[in-house]
Regions:
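Hydrophobic, Leu/Ile/Phe/Ala-enriched alpha-helical segments that form helix-helix packing faces
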Residues: 49, 53, 135-138, 179, ...
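Aromatic-acidic/polar surface patches that form glycan- and anion
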Residues: 35-42, 118, 195-202
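C-terminal catalytic lobe of FAD-dependent flavoproteins
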Residues: 158-221
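Gly/Ser/Thr-rich helix-start
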Residues: 6, 82, 193
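Active-site/ligand-binding neighborhood in enzyme catalytic cores
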Residues: 1-76, 87
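Mid-domain catalytic core of redox enzymes
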Residues: 61-178
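A broad, structural surface signal
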Residues: 44-47, 51, 88, 204, ...
Length: 221
């Protein structure tokens, strides 16, 4: 399978089950009763969150530059980076897949009939996304992004998809055990949990973690 660079039998069933097959006139990928995105898109949502008076953003700052004394000043640190990187790869690197995007402006109103089209056959790319569908924007031109799957190589590209199978999950569990020894550092996200989250599950994971911690760290006691 070109997205994963593996044979189907080498991929965990939970991953392959994420690709539904429908015989239907419904072109949507998901079948949830309620589906939505932020009214002005995710970029504006994140900008509004970061604009809060209690949030300070430090760019180009590696968490490793924080001293132990600085770390201890916080009731909780939520780490969304790669868990193997946090522990300096002491058990080895967790495998990932990466992506390369070609973003193009097309001189026509629409390029395709839906926001996302998957290409499982003999093309080098896997997905074409036409972004104007998300917010129902009107324009005589359109922008598409074409996704090309790649192997992840540390320092050369970005981690996108954890490759969940028995071998890799055993390696992740070694790092998970290390994380349990930390008093005030909590890991989540695709990289922190080494798990393939969609946006709804990523948000749900945050709420579950905060609910779990609300009586221990989010009180004035």
């Amino acid at each position: 399978m070109k997205q994963w660079g593996l044979k189907p039998e080498e991929i965990d069933a939970s991953v392959t089950a994420r690709v539904p097959i429908y015989i239907s006139n419904d072109s949507r990928y998901f079948q949830d009763k309620y589906q939505a995105i932020p009214i002005k898109g995710y970029t504006k949502l994140i900008e509004n969150i970061l604009n809060h008076k209690n949030i300070t953003v430090q760019l180009n700052t590696d968490y490793k530059t924080l001293s132990q004394n600085e770390i201890k000043e916080f009731k909780a640190i939520f780490y969304t980076g790669a868990i193997d990187e946090y522990f300096d790869y002491q058990y080895g690197e967790l495998p990932y897949r990466s992506l390369k995007f070609d973003i193009m402006t097309i001189d026509k109103e629409y390029y395709q009939k839906s926001v996302v089209t998957n290409y499982p056959n003999d093309y080098d790319f896997t997905i074409i996304t036409e972004h104007k569908y998300f917010l129902d924007e009107k324009s005589n031109k359109t922008i598409i992004s074409v996704e090309y799957p790649q192997a992840f190589s540390l320092g050369e590209n970005e981690r996108y998809y954890p490759i969940n199978n028995e071998k890799n999950d055993k390696l992740y569990n070694k790092y998970l055990r290390e994380s349990k020894r930390l008093e005030n550092v909590y890991f989540f996200s695709r990289l922190g949990d080494y798990k393939y989250y969609n946006m709804d599950l990523a948000v749900e994971r945050v709420f579950e973690l905060l609910k779990k911690l609300e009586n221990s760290i989010f009180t004035n006691k």
